[in-house]
Amino acid sequence: MLSGLIQRFEEEKMKHNQERVEELSLVRVDDTISQPPRYAPSAPMPSSMPTVALEILDKAMSNTTGATQTQKAEKAAFASYAEAFRDDVRLRQINRHVNEQIFPKLKSDLGGLKKKRAIIHMTLLVAAVVALLTSVCTLSSDMSVAFKLNGTSAEIPQWFKSLNPMLGVVNLGATFIMMVCAKSERGLNQQIDMIKKEVMKKQSYNDAVRMSFTEFSSVPLDGFELPLT
């Protein structure tokens, strides 16, 4: 029994000595020394393009209710500049080339719509003149208006009064043509305004890509230096 106690005491003593050695082997380092070394920031600074894009887009987000077409075109130009500032360099180049390819088609469509609007407008004017003349003729014959020529009274002949039904039909047809032409002209005006706005947006985008960015930084939007002339 005594030998067992001695053996147990020796084991506990050896264990205590081992823990003491392990504790002494640990080196305490100050917290400030244990921190990693501080280096100067080497990462590239974030581009200011998104901030500029947001500022430009803020000008384009104002209310356009009751605004003129010129003001709407101005807001569309601001939006295009903001889009150009926001896009990546490669995406800007792709959009610029696509815009240059679509410009001839847009201008051709715009010219065709303007010619069509001119034809419809002339038809509207002719129909308005016909409707006015037929209305005057019908009204004069219905009222049996008499004219004095060289002191003699001349009334509208009976055969002219018999044309009233036909004149009424012509007047109705001319009025219908006026309504159709007016509606078609309004639709064409909307399409022309939309195409003009689209052309303005694409031209503004291309101008933003091409322009030298010297007003804000030394880097142009194209990603390469532009010669100053």
Curated annotation (Swiss-Prot):
<keyword id="KW-1043">Host membrane</keyword>
<keyword id="KW-1032">Host cell membrane</keyword>
<feature type="transmembrane region" description="Helical">
    <location>
        <begin position="119"/>
        <end position="139"/>
    </location>
</feature>
<dbReference type="Pfam" id="PF01616">
    <property type="entry name" value="Orbi_NS3"/>
</dbReference>
<keyword id="KW-0812">Transmembrane</keyword>
<comment type="function">
    <text>Facilitates viral particle release either by increasing plasma membrane permeability through a viroporin-like activity or by viral budding.</text>
</comment>
<keyword id="KW-1090">Inhibition of host innate immune response by virus</keyword>
<keyword id="KW-1133">Transmembrane helix</keyword>
<comment type="subunit">
    <text>Forms homooligomers via coiled-coil motif. Interacts with host OPTN; this interaction inhibits innate immune response.</text>
</comment>
<protein>
    <recommendedName>
        <fullName>Non-structural protein P8</fullName>
    </recommendedName>
</protein>
<comment type="similarity">
    <text>Belongs to the orbivirus NS3 family.</text>
</comment>
<feature type="transmembrane region" description="Helical">
    <location>
        <begin position="162"/>
        <end position="182"/>
    </location>
</feature>
<dbReference type="GO" id="GO:0044177">
    <property type="term" value="C:host cell Golgi apparatus"/>
</dbReference>
<comment type="function">
    <text>Plays a role in the inhibition of host innate immune response. Interacts with host OPTN and thus inhibits the recruitment of TBK1 to the host Golgi apparatus. In turn, downstream partner IRF3 cannot be activated and IFN-beta production is impaired.</text>
</comment>
<dbReference type="GO" id="GO:0020002">
    <property type="term" value="C:host cell plasma membrane"/>
</dbReference>
<dbReference type="GO" id="GO:0052170">
    <property type="term" value="P:symbiont-mediated suppression of host innate immune response"/>
</dbReference>
<keyword id="KW-0472">Membrane</keyword>
<keyword id="KW-1040">Host Golgi apparatus</keyword>
<dbReference type="GO" id="GO:0016020">
    <property type="term" value="C:membrane"/>
</dbReference>
<keyword id="KW-0945">Host-virus interaction</keyword>
<keyword id="KW-0899">Viral immunoevasion</keyword>
<dbReference type="InterPro" id="IPR002565">
    <property type="entry name" value="Orbi_NS3"/>
</dbReference>
